[in-house]
Structure formats: C-alpha cells, structure tokens
C-alpha cells in the first residue's frame, strides 16, 4: 500500500506518544513544523517533481547535532536554551535529500558516557528492558529506533557511541572512516562552531537494517571544504 508522508509521520508521532514516556528517548519534538513539511512533501510527490532519496522520510537526530529551530543541548545544562539558526552539515545533507526532522534524541553530558543520562532530560531506558541502559552516547537514538519511534537516526562515535547502543538495542550502526561525514555543527564543541573540535569523533547512521545504513551513508558522505582531511589525497 502506498502511504503519504503525512501518514508516515503521524504514525511515528503516535508511537512516540505511546511508548516514549517509559523510555525517554525522544527529548524534543517539532511536530507542527514537521507536519507542514510532510504536507509539502506530499504536494511535491503529486507534482511528479524530482525527489531526493529520503523524500518525505520522518526521522529524529541525536541531540549532539544542531538542528535549525529545535532546542539542541548536547546534554549540557549550559546549552539547554540553544535553538540553532542552522543545521549541522550532516543534518543538512539529510534534509536536502528530503528527510523531515521531527525530533531530537537523548545523550549523556557532552556525549561522554556509555549510558544516556543528563541533568536536563534524565535517563533513557532500553526498550527491550526498561531496567537496563540502551548504551551511549547515541543511546536515545538507538532506543528510539528499537521502539519504532523513528526509522533512521544520525549518531556520532569516538569509542563506541554508535556501536555500543546499536548492539545493546539489537540494531545496525556504522562508524564510518574518519571525517568522510562532516561533523560541523556537532556539540561539542560549543554551539555555532565552524570546526569539529574533536579530532577523534565521527558522525554515522543507525538503522534497523544494513540496507537502510547504505541509503543513509550515500546521502551523508561528502567532501567538505573546511572539514574533510579524509578526502584530501595528495
């Protein structure tokens, strides 16, 4: 059965409403704007316009990335009122491919732990067992995916922050080669920075299948002028 972007988004929003109170994975919602974007996506689909590979796909983003118009904290109480005016570069690539960002998912303070607690939003629980952790630092991302609250997620990883939550929640996560996906707009460093600040961290997708990982990587991977030593072959 063919479904509209609006119907797909509404189904995920209903799932968030149903299961998120006990899991606490999705910590910020932008439902109204997302619904408007879904309606626009449906109109574009009906007009037979050229569509991106993620056209009309609703998704959430780890709260370590800046997302335009949605509170973006990095799990840091000092940044709890930060509402970016731009997207992180990796987020923008998803948006340019047609994705509709409808929320943010929980992280530990500055993405610096293998669990997902911070003083702003509290603790994220593993949807398979609410007494256990989904891991970290992309624990909110993995928990939201495993609980059917989102079909795709963008995470980040230094020492297991994508891989551990994917393992704990029975998902697929990929830590790509260093700097083939831009981390400009990742927190840390502080909001609004034009550099990544951390030479070890990489951005990467989490999904429920390897095929979905491949689709996401095709969108996310790109050389950036300021932030792509991996692409500069001499």
What do the PLM-derived regions correspond to, one by one?
Residues 175-234:
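A short helix-breaking turn/cap at a secondary-structure junction
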Residues 2-158:
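Gly/Ser-rich catalytic/binding loops embedded in alpha/beta enzyme cores
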Residues 163-168:
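Structural signature of FAD isoalloxazine-binding scaffolds in flavoprotein oxidoreductases
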Residues 169-175:
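Ligand-binding "clamshell"
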Residues 63-65, 160, 212, 220:
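Glycine-rich beta-alpha junction loops
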Residues 85-89, 139, 169, 208-211, ...:
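Residues forming well-ordered secondary-structure scaffolds
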